[in-house]
Amino acid sequence: MEVVSKIDQENQAKIWKQIFGFAESLVLKCAVQLEIAETLHNNVKPMSLSELASKLPAQPVNEDRLYRILHFLVHMKLFNKDATTQKYSLAPPAKYLLKGWEKSMVPSILSVTDKDFTAPWNHLGDGLTGNCNAFEKALGKGIRVYMRENPEKDQLFNEGMACDTRLFASALVNECKSIFSDGINTLAGVGRGTGTAVKAISKAFPDIKCTIHDLPEITSKNSKISRDVFKSVPSADAIFMKSILHEWNDEECIQILKRCKEAIPKGGKVIIADVVIDMDSTHPYSKSRLAMDLAMMLHTGGKERTEEDWKKLIDAAGFASCKITKLSALQSVIEAYPH
């Protein structure tokens, strides 16, 4: 029998890691559902296995099974285990597993790992040989019909998007103040969701009159108008869209951008918040951005785009120029100027 070389061993280990890649997402989901981070946080001091087991909301707890889940979570570096006391505590990333604060990632975790939303991934390769819609193949209908017929899933999705937008909006208003300070008096937020980003912009820049379009809820300061963005877009100095264009193919995006161009005055602009894929595999967000691209392909038939893709798209819609600003967030900001 051939001796396994060190290189072969490393390569086999790499494949085994990928085979069980799904385990990290589902163990993370389990930790959220069991409220492990909440329990440790509320206790303040590190906890032993038996202490933690006795305080979790779900009772009674099988300590052996909890131990094995915790072992995996410690390996993921989400929790710490003291070698001397054998007690568990929160590692720095675990703060994002806590509910009820503005940077909690719990809604995104529960949305992305939902069994229905992960089902289309089992049909990833099917679309290579035709126009297969993976979401429809997995769940029997397209995502937009599915969401209308399953309001609890629509709510779960919107909560996940709002969670992502809160993280993005914090970076946007702190790192991109100049975007909103060059003659913008009115801003129209266009898209699907809860208006989280526009509300953050309105709060950070109170002199800008903000309106929210096609959104289910608003703050008292803002106004809401229902509108089909393929037919028309509200007039404003700036049109703002977050995570909208990535839902659509290039031809559909060009239609939307043309409507936006018609709606803004001279000196106005379109502000797009979306993923910009780069080829730098060392960037902390690189893998997540590539995964988002596959998710859009599976769920809506849309795509994430490279910097060059964005420039071509904006040029095809008749804009004169664009500027891309990278933030400390999953998405970047693309400003499109008509003149």
Curated annotation (Swiss-Prot):
It is an enzyme of class 2 (transferase). Its EC number is 2.1.1.117. S-adenosyl-L-methionine binds at M161, T165, G191, D214, D228, V229, K242. Substrate binds at D164, S243, I244, L245, H246, E247. Keywords: Alkaloid metabolism, Methyltransferase, S-adenosyl-L-methionine, Transferase. It catalyses: (S)-scoulerine + S-adenosyl-L-methionine = (S)-tetrahydrocolumbamine + S-adenosyl-L-homocysteine + H(+). Belongs to the class I-like SAM-binding methyltransferase superfamily. Cation-independent O-methyltransferase family. COMT subfamily. Methyltransferase involved in the biosynthesis of the benzylisoquinoline alkaloid noscapine. Catalyzes the conversion of (S)-scoulerine to (S)-tetrahydrocolumbamine. This is Probable scoulerine-9-O-methyltransferase OMT3B. It comes from Papaver somniferum.
